[in-house]
Regions:
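Short alpha-helical hairpin
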Residues: 54-78, 167
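Membrane-proximal, proline-rich intrinsically disordered regions
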Residues: 3-57
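Conserved, well-structured interaction surfaces
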Residues: 68-151, 178, 182-185, 197-210
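Solvent-exposed, polar/charged alpha-helical surfaces in well-ordered, non-transmembrane soluble domains
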Residues: 26-29, 33, 37, 95-102, ...
């Protein structure tokens, strides 16, 4: 029709197909927006993440035995009452980031060409690419850091030899895959590698609501 149906083609930034659906730089910003949005949920920084640490320390106290967070306060959580929501969220966000990492390498840049980003910034394609990839690396590092803190032992317990969480750093087509857990040391190595690469890419500017250098 004359008014068009382009709005029907808008893709949710939290539900990305694995078949190479990301073809323009601005597509990758939508993926990052989805990651930031998911990180604000009640299973993560919107609520529970503060309880994981503070309720197990001296800063907070759970007064009701029926509280949904009493298991953290009493250190009596297991595979049935533990923080499962964050586990699923981590791998959901991680899947989208891995698609981003795969597809962003296929973009044919004109490095010096100036473009206008969805935030109305004037950047070269190379600057925009670097920002997007740098943010994605930093987000992946933060997610793995938090997962390792929640589901793994402290590094100093045994120099990182104990098991933490599986590291999934590429697109996995098999939905039934059951990867083995990596050690705490392996997780922290992946975290520091991602952050080191992110620092090299991010511009030294402040971006509201985004990860900054």
């Amino acid at each position: 029709s004359s008014c068009g149906n382009d709005w029907l083609d808008l893709q949710s930034s939290t539900a990305i197909e694995t078949d190479g659906s990301l073809t323009e730089l601005r597509d990758f910003e939508f993926v990052l927006n989805g990651a930031y949005s998911s990180m604000q949920s009640s299973s993560y920084y919107g609520a529970d993440m503060f309880c994981y640490g503070d309720l197990r320390g001296d800063d907070m106290k759970s007064y009701k035995s029926s509280s949904t967070n009493v298991s953290f306060y009493t250190f009596k959580y297991n595979k049935t009452n533990g923080p499962s929501g964050f586990w699923g969220m981590y791998y959901g966000i991680g899947k989208n980031l891995n698609i981003l990492f795969r597809d962003i390498e296929k973009i044919k840049l004109v490095p010096d060409r100036e473009i206008t980003t969805p935030k109305l910034e004037k950047l070269t394609e190379q600057e925009y690419y670097n920002d997007l990839k740098g943010e994605a690396l930093a987000i992946r590092a933060l997610l793995l850091f938090d997962m390792t803190r929640i589901y793994g032992y402290p590094y100093l317990k045994d120099n990182g030899a104990s098991l933490a969480v599986p590291i999934i750093d590429k697109v996995v087509e098999d939905k039934n895959i059951k990867p083995s857990r990596n050690t705490t040391a392996q997780c922290y190595k992946a975290i520091t590698d991602d952050l080191t690469d992110a620092v090299k890419l991010l511009r030294p500017v402040k971006k509201e609501g985004k990860i900054n250098k």
